[in-house]
């Protein structure tokens, strides 16, 4: 297919130009990190490298903010340095799938949704803590957001059902605004 050939040629030329100018983009750095932290076994399976295992021993916990914007490469990087395949669940992930904004960077909000669906609310090796209290906004704002998302967000559209568990509840007290 001509389009595929053109895309491959463009990729090769872009890589050449970046090498000539000693440039790396974010994606290049992710893939270089993969080469360092993963190795291929004889059977073709990718496993953590010795470097990844060294990091694994150093990291007691791995904190990830905005997890809903992670992509598969980042997930593989995190898996390589966390202890999950050793039975040590040491990742602390924070995110809100309703805020996923990096599809252009191949973000996979379904990674977040998978963990959201499988982690328990209490007890167990992987615990999910739902933060429903909003300390930033007045109730007029959270009420509006809740009403809008209740109408728009469904499992088929955003991967999450917007219900009482997903809603925001105002927790801060604000002084009354002038003109009310």
Which residues make up each language-model segment?
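Non-catalytic alpha-helical coupling and interface elements of nucleotide-dependent molecular machines
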Residues: 38, 64, 83, 117-121, ...
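Short, polar/flexible loop-turn hinges at active-site or ligand-entry regions and domain interfaces
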Residues: 19-21, 43-48, 101, 119-129, ...
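Helicase-core coupling region on the C-terminal RecA-like lobe
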Residues: 130-180
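Conserved helicase NTPase motor core
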Residues: 1-114, 130-140
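Short helix-terminating capping/connector loops at secondary-structure junctions
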Residues: 56, 86-88, 122-126, 178-179
């Amino acid at each position: 297919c001509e389009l595929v050939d053109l895309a491959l040629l463009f990729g090769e030329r872009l890589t050449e130009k970046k090498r000539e100018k000693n440039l790396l983009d974010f994606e290049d750095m992710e893939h270089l990190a993969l080469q360092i932290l993963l190795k291929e076994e004889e059977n073709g399976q990718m496993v953590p490298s010795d470097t990844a295992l060294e990091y694994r021993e150093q990291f007691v916990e791995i904190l990830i903010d905005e997890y809903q914007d992670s992509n598969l490469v980042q997930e593989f990087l995190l898996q390589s340095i966390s202890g999950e395949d050793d039975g040590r669940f040491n990742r602390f992930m924070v995110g809100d799938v309703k805020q996923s904004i990096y599809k252009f960077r191949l973000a996979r909000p379904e990674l977040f949704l998978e963990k959201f669906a499988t982690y328990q609310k209490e007890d167990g090796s992987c615990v999910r803590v739902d933060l429903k209290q909003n300390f930033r906004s007045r109730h007029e704002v959270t009420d509006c957001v809740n009403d809008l998302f209740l109408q728009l967000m469904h499992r088929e559209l955003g991967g999450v059902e917007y219900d009482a568990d997903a809603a925001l509840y105002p927790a801060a007290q604000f002084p009354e605004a002038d003109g009310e």
